[in-house]
Amino acid sequence: MMMLMTSITISFLLPMIVMLLATTLSKKSINDREKSSPFECGFDPKLNMPFSIQFFLIAVIFLIFDVEIALILPIVIIMKTSNIMVWTLSTMLFIIILLVGLYYEWNQGALKWAN
């Protein structure tokens, strides 16, 4: 039992000591402003540019509809093995949900690029 406790203690302490040594030895002693800033081919860095929320919303909507289209693709393969009535109803329900979501986004103005 004592051997087990010793090996567990060593297995926890040894990596902690190694990580502590690596952290302290790898620190830079001099913080240079030019070396800390991003390199942008001689141009002034544009880190504080405002990001368009409208562009972000369009990207998220595209991502959502892209995933939904990827979910539609296997429906054609399922058609051969399932009941045609169940397949038709489930496909129509899925497409109606897509269209309702598109209408909602359109109605809320999320698809308008400019005011």
Curated annotation (Swiss-Prot):
One Pfam family named in its UniProt record: Oxidored_q4
GO MF annotation list: NADH dehydrogenase (ubiquinone) activity
Disulfide bonds: none
A Gene Ontology cellular-component term: mitochondrial membrane
Membrane topology term: Multi-pass membrane protein
Enzyme Commission number(s): 7.1.1.2
Catalytic activity, as annotated: a ubiquinone + NADH + 5 H(+)(in) = a ubiquinol + NAD(+) + 4 H(+)(out)
Keywords assigned: Electron transport, Membrane, Mitochondrion, NAD, Respiratory chain, Translocase, Transmembrane, Transmembrane helix, Transport, Ubiquinone
Enzyme class: translocase
Subcellular location: Mitochondrion membrane
Residues annotated as transmembrane: 1-21, 58-78, 84-104
Recorded superkingdom: Eukaryota
Family as reported in the entry's similarity comment: Belongs to the complex I subunit 3 family.
Function as written in the Swiss-Prot or TrEMBL entry: Core subunit of the mitochondrial membrane respiratory chain NADH dehydrogenase (Complex I) that is believed to belong to the minimal assembly required for catalysis. Complex I functions in the transfer of electrons from NADH to the respiratory chain. The immediate electron acceptor for the enzyme is believed to be ubiquinone.
Record's protein name: NADH-ubiquinone oxidoreductase chain 3
